[in-house]
């Protein structure tokens, strides 16, 4: 192994890399006409890697400007399955007037890098680039092939990003058996049952399914002044009300059970699935409790209503869109409950269908995560958890790839990490970036 040291360490480069990445406005509105695209940012990423000797492939995924970059570093044992390290270049839009700094400034101040994407997820993109550059410059050969993928459109479901790549360019991921990406690896500080604090590092091993459902009610059109007993708006409103107010039962998956058991061991709290106050106990975890609480049960949140075109015309139809988040292995039960709630006079159709995902919390890759974290934070304990949202892991899982959320960040206990996702004044601590870069480097050397 080459030990030349006349080039920067990953931790020397990561802050400037993340700041530079944020300065690319890669806002994704969800509409091609108004989305800026990732092309300029993707080409910049490619230049950072090609500068040190990587061969990168730039791919536009289904639409002009939706840029992706993929490269591979050969490992010592080519017979082993490759490891994919992936991150998305797009970000959600930001309204500059709401921020204390410009959201695309990449400002470095008060110990933080500020801007849209600092947490979601240009922090990891910067860490990936920094470590990849170091491995190439040093001539380090990892134990297995590493595939680095920087992709588009995650914030809108990946149709013009990972979804397209998996469908049209699966060759880019040939031989990949495992993957790491968002959202996991961050620390959660909890009060220890014997006093003091304990840092848990949450490794994502599961995601709820994301299915957007359109409800349609049909009735008899007519004049608004008449008595009317077949009003589509009234029928739809009743169905939406029943669905939106319904609390689905608690179902603890393996991942959530393991998470609650680990937290209980450290804090002394009891997380009983049959307790009527389970939600209240989970809320004691602080800000992360919002994420964990959302993984205890299925959910169906009405988000859009459409009906009518004039105040005095009773429309012949009315529609609603419902954001459904479904636990792994629970789709059939969820659909049966929905059908009962909406009733026979409302039809449903799925307009987006990204299935749930869950893997086990074991194996050599999990051991490597644990070892890398313990080497930098001897007080670390890793625990599995489920993400209530969705990531590109849903697409990669279709290729048979075992996916984890692992972006190592040691966070200040007082930082409301969950609120920074898509939030105003999104920022990442500089110390968290340097910590994460060191952990990621160690992990990739022993993966």
Language-model features: locations:
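Metal-dependent amide/peptide-bond hydrolase catalytic core
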Residues: 1-4, 9, 185-206, 210-441, ...
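Solvent-exposed loop/turn segments at secondary-structure junctions
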Residues: 29, 91-92, 153-156, 185-187, ...
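Short beta-strand segments
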Residues: 86-87, 150, 180-182, 216-218, ...
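Short pre-catalytic strand/loop immediately N-terminal to key active-site residues, enriched for Gly-Thr
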Residues: 109-120, 380-383, 424
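Acidic/histidine-rich catalytic neighborhood of metal-dependent amide-processing enzymes
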Residues: 112-113, 119-202
């Amino acid at each position: 192994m080459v030990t030349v040291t006349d080039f920067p360490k990953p931790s020397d480069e990561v802050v400037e890399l993340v700041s530079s990445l944020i300065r690319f406005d890669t806002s994704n509105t969800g509409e091609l006409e108004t989305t800026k695209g990732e092309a300029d940012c993707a080409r910049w990423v490619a230049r950072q890697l090609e500068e040190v000797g990587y061969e990168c492939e730039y791919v536009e995924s289904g639409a002009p400007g939706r840029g992706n970059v993929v490269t591979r570093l050969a490992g010592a044992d080519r017979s082993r399955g490759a490891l994919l390290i992936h991150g998305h270049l797009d970000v959600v839009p930001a309204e500059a007037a709401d921020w204390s700094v410009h959201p695309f400034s990449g400002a470095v101040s008060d110990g933080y890098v500020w801007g849209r994407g600092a947490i979601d997820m240009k922090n990891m993109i910067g860490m990936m680039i920094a470590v990849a550059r170091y491995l190439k410059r040093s001539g380090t050969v990892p134990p297995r092939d590493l595939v680095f993928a920087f992709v588009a459109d995650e914030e809108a479901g990946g149709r013009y990003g990972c979804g397209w790549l998996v469908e049209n360019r699966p060759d880019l991921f040939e031989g990949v058996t495992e993957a790491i990406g968002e959202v996991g690896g961050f620390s959660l500080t909890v009060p220890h049952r014997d006093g003091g604090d304990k840092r848990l590092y949450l490794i994502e091993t599961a995601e709820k399914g994301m299915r957007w459902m359109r409800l349609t009610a049909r009735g008899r059109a007519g004049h608004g002044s008449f008595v009317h007993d077949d009003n589509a708006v009234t029928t739809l409103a009743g169905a939406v009300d029943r669905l939106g107010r319904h609390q689905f039962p608690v179902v603890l998956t393996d991942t959530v059970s393991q998470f609650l058991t680990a937290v209980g061991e450290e804090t002394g709290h009891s997380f009983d699935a049959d307790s009527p106050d389970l939600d209240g106990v989970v809320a004691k975890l602080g800000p992360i409790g919002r994420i964990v609480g959302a993984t205890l049960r299925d959910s169906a949140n009405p988000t859009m209503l459409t009906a009518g075109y004039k105040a005095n015309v009773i429309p012949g139809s009315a529609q609603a869109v419902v954001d459904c988040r479904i636990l792994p292995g629970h789709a059939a039960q969820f659909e049966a409950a929905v059908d009962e709630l909406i009733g026979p006079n409302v039809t449903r159709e799925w307009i987006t269908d990204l299935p749930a995902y869950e893997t086990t919390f074991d194996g050599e890759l999990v051991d490597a995560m644990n070892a890398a974290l313990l080497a930098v934070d001897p007080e670390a304990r890793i625990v599995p958890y489920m993400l209530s949202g969705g990531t590109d892991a849903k697409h990669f899982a279709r290729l048979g790839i075992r996916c984890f959320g692992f972006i190592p960040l040691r966070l200040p206990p007082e930082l409301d990490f969950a609120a920074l996702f898509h939030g105003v004044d999104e920022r990442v601590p500089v110390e968290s970036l340097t910590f994460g870069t060191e952990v990621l480097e160690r992990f990739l050397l022993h993966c």
